[in-house]
Each structure stands twice: as structure tokens, then as C-alpha cells.
């Protein structure tokens, strides 16, 4: 049964939702080597994006490192919204002699809001150290196996995860009433 479309914008949104993400070279390599993953639509710059389950992140990252992705350019997290997933992402770059056009891929791990746990990639890319700590501090994502997972920006006794979209600062209303 076809879905009813009431406007041109709804038609475009429906096409985007049902479109199959094109498979990039990294996804092809992962499939060839038996790594379970899901291809996502490339970002606005054309960077290939791949969704990975949390329990498969470490073996997949180890394989990508061996494949030549020797640089963790950025690791971060974001909140999709109240009641939705938290996302831990990893932007990897294959640094070679061709510095003008390096191969890039972004891995995304979608995590539940309650007990978000993902393995640490610190032992593969040391650059993940403070980045994983910041994501823990701001979103409450636990990076299992991290050597020093503690708050890095907020005071040690801070309650809650300030960058979650459902976070309400306990002092917000008191500060607002003071003015």
C-alpha cells in the first residue's frame, strides 16, 4: 500500500527516508572481510558514514587501523533528542603520501540513553584519550577499557550529563528568578 503524500516537501522526505545509501569503498572492504555494519548516507562533504554495533566497534576499528586508517581526526558524541539514541562517532583518516585527497570514513555507534556503554578505542588511537573523557563528561557515555575515564570539564561532584537534550540544570530556575 502506497503512503499518502500531501505536499512536495513530504514527497522529498519520503524519498530520503526510503533511499538506499550508496556503498562506499570502506563499506565494500568491510563487507569483503566479513565485518557486520550498515552503510549510511555520506555527509555533505562526501565522507562515507558507517553504522556499527557497540560490541563490534573494537574489532572493526582494529581492522581499519591495519587497513591504513592511522589517524583519529575526531571522536565525539551527540544526542538525537529526548527519548532517542546517543551517538558516539569516530572520524578516521587514512594518511598516505597523497595528502590532497585522503580517504576518510566516519563510524557511528547508536547507544541507548540508559546505560550507554561502548568500548574505548584509546588502545588503537591515543588521540581518543581526552575526547572520550569529554563525551563521558557531557553525555554519560561509558568508554569501557579507558585508562582514566573521569570528568574532564565539569567538577567531579557534578550531577548529570549537561549536553543531553533532556538535561535540566538543577539551579536554572533559581538563577532565572534572581534577576
UniProtKB/Swiss-Prot annotation:
Disulfide bonds: none annotated. Its main location: membrane. GO terms for molecular function: NADH dehydrogenase (ubiquinone) activity; quinone binding. GO terms for biological process: photosynthesis, light reaction. It is a peripheral membrane protein. InterPro entries: NADH_DH_suC (IPR010218), NADH_quin_OxRdtase_su_C/D-like (IPR037232), NADH_UbQ_OxRdtase_30kDa_su (IPR001268), NADH_UbQ_OxRdtase_CS (IPR020396). It is found in: Cellular thylakoid membrane. It is an enzyme of class 7 (translocase). Keywords: Membrane, NAD, NADP, Plastoquinone, Quinone, Thylakoid, Translocase, Transport. Pfam families: Complex1_30kDa. GO terms for cellular component: plasma membrane-derived thylakoid membrane. Its EC number is 7.1.1.-. It comes from the Bacteria. In at one experiment the initiator methionine has been seen to be kept and removed. It catalyses: a plastoquinone + NADH + (n+1) H(+)(in) = a plastoquinol + NAD(+) + n H(+)(out); a plastoquinone + NADPH + (n+1) H(+)(in) = a plastoquinol + NADP(+) + n H(+)(out). NDH-1 can be composed of about 15 different subunits; different subcomplexes with different compositions have been identified which probably have different functions. Belongs to the complex I 30 kDa subunit family. NDH-1 shuttles electrons from an unknown electron donor, via FMN and iron-sulfur (Fe-S) centers, to quinones in the respiratory and/or the photosynthetic chain. The immediate electron acceptor for the enzyme in this species is believed to be plastoquinone. Couples the redox reaction to proton translocation, and thus conserves the redox energy in a proton gradient. Cyanobacterial NDH-1 also plays a role in inorganic carbon-concentration. This is NAD(P)H-quinone oxidoreductase subunit J. It comes from Synechocystis sp. (strain ATCC 27184 / PCC 6803 / Kazusa).
Amino acid at each position: 500500500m502506497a503512503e499518502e503524500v500531501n505536499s512536495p516537501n513530504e514527497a522529498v522526505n519520503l524519498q530520503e527516508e526510503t533511499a538506499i545509501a550508496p556503498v562506499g569503498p570502506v563499506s565494500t572492504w568491510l563487507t569483503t572481510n566479513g565485518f557486520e555494519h550498515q552503510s549510511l548516507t555520506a555527509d555533505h562533504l562526501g565522507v562515507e558514514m558507517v553504522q556499527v554495533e557497540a560490541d563490534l566497534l573494537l574489532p572493526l576499528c582494529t581492522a581499519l587501523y591495519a587497513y591504513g586508517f592511522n589517524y583519529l581526526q575526531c571522536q565525539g558524541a551527540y544526542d538525537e533528542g529526548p527519548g532517542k539514541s546517543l551517538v558516539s562517532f569516530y572520524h578516521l583518516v587514512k594518511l598516505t603520501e597523497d595528502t590532497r585527497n585522503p580517504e576518510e570514513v566516519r563510524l557511528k555507534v547508536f547507544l541507548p540513553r540508559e546505560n550507554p556503554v561502548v568500548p574505548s578505542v584509546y588502545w588503537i588511537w591515543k588521540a581518543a584519550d581526552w575526547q572520550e573523557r569529554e563525551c563521558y563528561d557531557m553525555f554519560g557515555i561509558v568508554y569501557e577499557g579507558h585508562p582514566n575515564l573521569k570528568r574532564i570539564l565539569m567538577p567531579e561532584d557534578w550531577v548529570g550529563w549537561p549536553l543531553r537534550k533532556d538535561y535540566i540544570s538543577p539551579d536554572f530556575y533559581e538563577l532565572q528568578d534572581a534577576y
